[in-house]
Amino acid sequence: MAQISKQEALDYHEKGRPGKIAVVPTKPHATAHDLSLAYSPGVAEPCLEIEKQPHDAYRYTNKGNLVAVISNGTAVLGLGDIGALAGKPVMEGKSLLFKIYGGVDSFDIEVDEHDPERFIQVVKAIAPTFGGINLEDIKAPECFEIETRLKAELDIPVMHDDQHGTAIISCAGLLNALQVVGKRIEDVRMVVNGAGAAAISCARLYLSFGLRRENLVMLDSRGVISTARTDINEQKREFATDRTDVHTLQEAMRGADVFVGLSKGNIVDADMVRSMAERPIIFALANPVPEITYDDAKAARPDVLMSTGRTDYPNQINNVIGFPYIFRGALDVAATAINEPMKQAAVRAIAALAQQPVPDYVAQAYGLKELTFGADYFIPKPVDKRLIVEVSSAVARAAIESGVARRPIEDWDAYRARLATLIEE
């Protein structure tokens, strides 16, 4: 991973126009007539149309391509609870990624509120502005209540990306990794180390794809989450095991086919990796330091399939290959939600793309001559421009088929062609 100095990072954000995003007009504005259309008196006409038919906001405003990136700064990357304002650079960065990868406009909104109920009310009050809401960096367990309530009480897509983005990308990677090693998800034994928002969402999604609950062991900072424990919340209790033979990570890893780490760095050692089943799969997703490094895992078990959150090793789990395209597809059909069928469609589309021949420009971006589906490539790269077409169209189709779309797509070939050019605009 390229080393970045503190001063380089500060200069990047400060020099020129401070920050990373700006508002750009989309209509002519050079003449007095243009301005009279953009504002008074011409602006009254779309206002009156929207008053009569609220859905016309999608016709006359940018609502249909606008997402709010909303955070209270209570769980910012590896920084923890740094507060709403200090989290603003991260939210601006998320907005930048929405635009460059998905062509989605977004406003970053930092809400200085820790109380879940008051936070929910703030988001509901500003929701009419947006076509979708991306919740970001909100600590568990409050994030579960906040997302659940907002999904139920708003008629636009709401997604907490820290939960579902990680789950979707890792699930796509898991399905492909299992194919490479010749195992079925229904048969594997899995260890999930971590029980926060991302870990809970990952486990739920894996189960929906066939993982058996009895084959899953989840751990938090106090050890295995078991039915015998009385110190666990309702989200953790959902994954409590009744096994009495495992109490520690070392015991849980013995004979496991899959390890998914969403915890802290350097918690897995070589002996644990050696104790795993034949051709084990390790997703060490703690950032910036994974639970075990790629080199250490490979040294312990040359047959391991490995994924991390880092760019300098194969098979990076990176949410940017998910959220811009999930929201793109949801916005394009004016969806009222991002539901399970849409998330599952994203998983399948991402997994399928990795199995297709890879364009030369993708391999060259990583200094490689070629990329071929297998142990060192089972997750698409973020620079792959096919993602916007495949994932967005899959999500849009799932929204229509599951009944949450308010705007149909009549010509799928034309839609896919438009997606292919969108990020070039």
Q: Each predicted region: which residue ranges?
A:
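Glycine-rich phosphate/diphosphate-binding loop of Rossmann-like nucleotide-binding domains
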Residues: 77, 82-102, 154, 160, ...
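Short, ordered loop/turn segments at secondary-structure junctions
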Residues: 72-74, 82, 111-112, 137-140, ...
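Solvent-exposed alpha-helices and their adjacent loops that cap or buttress functional pockets
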Residues: 58-63, 99-100, 125-127, 151-152, ...
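N-terminal ligand-binding/catalytic initiation module
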Residues: 1-158, 392, 397-408, 422-425
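General beta-strand structural signal in soluble alpha/beta enzymes
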Residues: 108, 134-137, 158-161, 192, ...
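Adenosine-phosphate binding glycine-rich loop
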Residues: 161-162, 181-183, 284-409
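Rossmann-like adenosine-cofactor binding region
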Residues: 237-305, 310-312
